[in-house]
Swiss-Prot record:
InterPro entries cross-referenced by the UniProt entry: N/Namide_PRibTrfase, NAPRTase_N, Nic_PRibTrfase, Nic_PRibTrfase-Fam, Nicotinate_pribotase-like_C
Cysteine-cysteine disulfides: none
Biological process, per Gene Ontology: NAD biosynthetic process via the salvage pathway
Catalytic reaction list: nicotinate + 5-phospho-alpha-D-ribose 1-diphosphate + ATP + H2O = nicotinate beta-D-ribonucleotide + ADP + phosphate + diphosphate
EC number: 6.3.4.21
Top EC class for this record: ligase
CDD domains the UniProt entry points to: PncB_like
Keywords attached to this entry: Ligase, Phosphoprotein, Pyridine nucleotide biosynthesis
Involved pathway(s): Cofactor biosynthesis; NAD(+) biosynthesis; nicotinate D-ribonucleotide from nicotinate: step 1/1
The species this protein was found in: Edwardsiella ictaluri (strain 93-146)
SUPFAM superfamilies reported in the protein's UniProt record: Nicotinate/Quinolinate PRTase C-terminal domain-like (SSF51690), Nicotinate/Quinolinate PRTase N-terminal domain-like (SSF54675)
PTM statement from Swiss-Prot or TrEMBL: Transiently phosphorylated on a His residue during the reaction cycle. Phosphorylation strongly increases the affinity for substrates and increases the rate of nicotinate D-ribonucleotide production. Dephosphorylation regenerates the low-affinity form of the enzyme, leading to product release.
A Gene Ontology term for the protein's cellular component: cytosol
Descriptive protein name: Nicotinate phosphoribosyltransferase
């Protein structure tokens, strides 16, 4: 099967920017922390038949290494320190850390080991799963088909937005993890760069480098989840995560993710010092209008001008949804819109995969994500979910999944 031989992932930079940002912080602060992460398919699809092909790709990823050209690119950015980049240059992903099996048709994947290494598996592995599955299901889809579909979407957007001043509309490509394929991803970004003046950048470091785009991203749920076990007092864990991030990046990468333990619990921890230092907030679950109103009200209650802050929306967006949010908020606060699947897997007759890889353990103990959307809650340990809800004064209503 020659189609299995060619590697899908050919660069360590073919990942989301925040993975490298978080990895540097982990390297500096939590070098000896161990974690485990697991794959989840939120739908009812049986993907186990692809386990062998995915495992072949994982083995190929063990050959990846940072090139001198890539090292020089990262070194020229303001985020990275030389000690981290020197270590990253020596890093080789270890496929033995990734356990893959076909469990009666279900795809099971568990990644375990040092956090500083495990952290790099999630995004490229999800991209591999998506590309392998779509390669079998929709072999007729080409990058040209994707570009033509995007042109139709952009035409619709121009029509819908004809009456709006879009100078404050900022689109970010968040499409790596559930893209149809790398070739489709590249075609989408090429089209956006030439046809859409409101593209601010991409979360993908490889394409940012190759296409002279701005790389964008800060931190993910796993940063907050791991602190649930790193921090000695569970109730202080979210504040500890926020402070540790500021210690690593005091003057940059200042967008905070709010929904690891619900927006309400986040805002209780996000006092005037954090709100003043952080540039803004990212929405990833729950009602985006209600969330944005809470964020603006919180800034105002703290005496901070919302027009000095940024809201980043990234939950299941497409261009019409982003435009609706822009209409609602753009006179009151700065806005960016991270669109992923609806850019890089928006194709005729193709159903995108609803797949994630999330942290489930840190230092051998459970961690949880209690998002603002019940279906996105992740934890296998009901007792820990109960303890987390008690620590953050949340009602004991949502069942862990």
């Amino acid at each position: 099967m020659t189609q299995d031989v060619s590697p899908i992932i050919t660069s360590l930079l073919d990942t989301d920017a925040y993975k490298l940002h978080m990895q540097q912080a982990v390297y500096h602060r939590y070098r000896n922390v161990s974690v485990a992460a697991e794959f989840r398919c939120r739908g009812d699809e049986l993907l186990g038949e692809y386990a062998g092909e995915i495992a072949n790709q994982v083995n190929l990823m063990g050959q990846l290494a940072l090139t001198q050209d890539e090292y020089d690119y990262l070194a020229a950015l303001p985020f990275f320190q030389r000690d981290y980049l020197d270590w990253l240059r020596t890093l080789r992903l270890d496929p033995r850390r990734v356990a893959i099996s076909n469990d009666r048709g279900r795809l099971n994947i568990r990644i375990s080991g040092p956090w500083r290494e495990v952290i790099l598996w999630e995004v490229p592995l999800l991209a591999v799963i998506s590309e392998v599955v779509h390669r079998h299901r929709s072999p007729h889809i080409t990058p040209e088909v994707a570009a033509a579909q995007l042109q139709r979407r952009l035409s619709e957007f121009r029509h819908l937005s004809a009456d709006v001043d879009l100078r404050g509309f900022h689109l970010i490509d968040f499409g790596t993890r559930r893209r149809f394929s790398r070739a489709v991803h590249q075609a989408i970004l090429t089209t956006l760069k030439s046809e859409f003046p409101y593209l601010s950048g991409t979360s993908n470091y490889l394409f940012a480098k190759q296409m002279a785009l701005t790389p964008l991203g800060t931190q993910a749920h796993e940063w907050f989840q791991a602190h649930q076990q790193i921090c000695p007092v569970l109730a202080n864990s979210q504040r500890a995560a926020l402070q540790s991030w500021l210690d690593e990046y005091p003057d940059q990468l200042g967008i905070a993710l709010t929904d690891c333990i619900t927006m309400d619990a986040f805002l209780r921890d996000f006092g005037s010092q954090f709100a003043g230092h952080y540039q803004g907030l990212r929405h990833d679950s729950g009602d985006p209008i209600a969330w944005g109103e809470k964020a603006i009200a919180h800034y105002e209650q703290l005496g901070l001008d919302p027009q000095d802050k940024m809201l980043v929306f990234s939950d299941n967006l497409d261009l019409p949804k982003a435009l609706a949010l822009y209409r609602h908020f753009h006179h009151r606060i700065n806005l960016s819109f991270g669109i992923g699947t609806r850019l890089t897997c928006d194709l005729p007759g193709v159903r995108p995969l609803n797949i994630v890889i999330k942290l489930v353990e840190c230092n051998g103990k459970p961690v949880a994500k209690l998002s603002d959307s019940p279906g996105k809650t992740i934890c296998q340990d009901a007792a820990f979910v109960k303890a987390l809800r008690k620590a953050f004064d949340l009602p004991l209503v949502k069942r862990a999944s």
